[in-house]
Amino acid sequence: MLLAQINRDSQGMTEFPGGGMEAQHVTLCLTEAVTVADGDNLENMEGVSLQAVTLADGSTAYIQHNSKDGRLIDGQVIQLEDGSAAYVQHVPIPKSTGDSLRLEDGQAVQLEDGTTAFIHHTSKDSYDQSSLQAVQLEDGTTAYIHHAVQVPQPDTILAIQADGTVAGLHTGDATIDPDTISALEQYAAKVSIDGSEGVTSTGLIGENEQEKKMQIVLQGHATRVTPKSQQSGEKAFRCKYDGCGKLYTTAHHLKVHERSHTGDRPYQCEHSGCGKAFATGYGLKSHFRTHTGEKPYRCSEDNCTKSFKTSGDLQKHIRTHTGERPFKCPIEGCGRSFTTSNIRKVHIRTHTGERPYYCTEPGCGRAFASATNYKNHVRIHTGEKPYVCTVPGCDKRFTEYSSLYKHHVVHTHSKPYNCNHCGKTYKQISTLAMHKRTAHNDTEPIEEEQEAFFEPPPGQGDDVLKGSQITYVTGVEGEDIVSTQVATVTQSGLSQQVTLISQDGTQHVNISQADMQAIGNTITMVTQDGTPITVPTHDAVISSAGTHSVAMVTAEGTEGQQVAIVAQDLAAFHAASSEMGHQPHSHHLVTTETRPLTLVATSNGTQIAVQLGEQPSLEEAIRIASRIQQGETPGLDD
């Protein structure tokens, strides 16, 4: 069996350097959906292939050659376009001992950053399953490597994958020059961005829902095989930079690794005003989606509507559903595991104490274990807040993406964090972590998604705050009735109200663990004019039935209006509200169900009734108050 190709009408041109001579033109054929043919003749093999030739200075170049015109003889002298002479040299490929490469499920392979990934196979209906290999890269991306079983002519088919890398290029001691690989990848990346193709969920380039690949045909003398060094996992390519010495299984991975030493970023974003550059073609393609807004990778999990820019981000997200944590901490006695190797790498620094990222601000001297934390810290010095909320009328800015990400759910009302024990959902990851600790005694840290797109769950509508919200209306006659929702926070174990906040976000309270402990038996609330008020209470006042009045104390310590404390039953509240209903601008409770009422307060003649839902824990009260201080308006159930 062999892999055939059908030529498209268009052909792309690129150049490869040829030593000191001018660059040689090479034709790359963008091929449509692959087909399979039997026998010694390759079906539908039209078009121009690449021929390796040795130039006069000893370097290797690649020239156009049509196989129909006959074969070039090894050592033959040919005339190039610039008039110079070149010598034909066939790239030798070792003979196969039989079957083609078959990487077993779970087999370890070395990736470009030096870490180990494992092979796994995925189903592709339109391809010969024995010739497709799936490699899960470190960031979660699944790369599909094609290994041709046999190429009779003898040609070697080199497939440029959707991530811009070249598969099937390196065999034995005779490898294609790394500069050639780089040129091929740059061309593939440019075609991927400039062309009209989309990227399918399979990770291959597709158009009109047909899977496509870019292929190059190189003239050779033998069948495509894989050297035994690769089958045994031996690493044949060593980094020659001083103090490094890392080994890689392919010249391509070594080439990419060397860019970490040289700082070379050959893939430049051509979007107007951007100018960012990347070390790999896949990095450029992923970045380009930040300009287009494209998020083609959607989670297929039921009731999950998240989308992602890369397949790697999607696969990392899927692990939040499956619970898979394939990257284990190697430190003896730790036992922690993680969804990505990068998170594991940062975690390992908690064992070693390594903090490689130092702040260069004079007088600062702080160091960080992760680049993300370092960059976020630097913005404290610069005052930069590059992340802006795009919701109309909001315009809030943040120093780090995670803060914008967390803020975004305030507008969408999504609850993306779910408990893997009981299924409860939460808006904030900190609330989920608190729930897991208190309800399930689970102290395992929760990893946050930083590249997510949220949509409100269907049918949720505008019913945002639940549990602890009430609606009150002014007692003014006519149609000028103002309706406001009030979110409340209670202290666990006590029946009194701790904080009162209106939903419009104009009222703020600064509360901490120490503040909460210092309050003791007091009631803290914020009135409608924004004045914080502390109400001293007594157990007898709160616990006894009936209506009681206490003097409000403002933040400045001056005594103010009277606050009516109502016993926790609806009848008592109705009696109290009836008495106070004769006061000007009184407010009456509007509720659809009977719930305990804890507090009735007056502020400048306005009465406020608070109806409680479920009482949260003390930690949740502190967390909600902290969010309110940041300008958010949470409910108790988020």
From Swiss-Prot:
SMART domains: ZnF_C2H2. Keywords: Acetylation, Activator, DNA-binding, Isopeptide bond, Metal-binding, Nucleus, Phosphoprotein, Repeat, Transcription, Transcription regulation, Ubl conjugation, Zinc, Zinc-finger. There is a cross-link at residues 213, 406 (Glycyl lysine isopeptide (Lys-Gly) (interchain with G-Cter in SUMO2)). A zinc finger (C2H2-type) spans 237-261, 267-291, 297-321, 327-351, 357-381, 387-411, 417-440. PROSITE patterns: ZINC_FINGER_C2H2_1, ZINC_FINGER_C2H2_2. Transcriptional activator. In complex with HCFC1 and ZNF143, regulates the expression of several genes, including AP2S1, ESCO2, OPHN1, RBL1, UBXN8 and ZNF32. Activates the gene for selenocysteine tRNA (tRNAsec). Binds to the SPH motif of small nuclear RNA (snRNA) gene promoters. Participates in efficient U6 RNA polymerase III transcription via its interaction with CHD8. Belongs to the GLI C2H2-type zinc-finger protein family. This is Zinc finger protein 143. It comes from Rattus norvegicus (Rat).
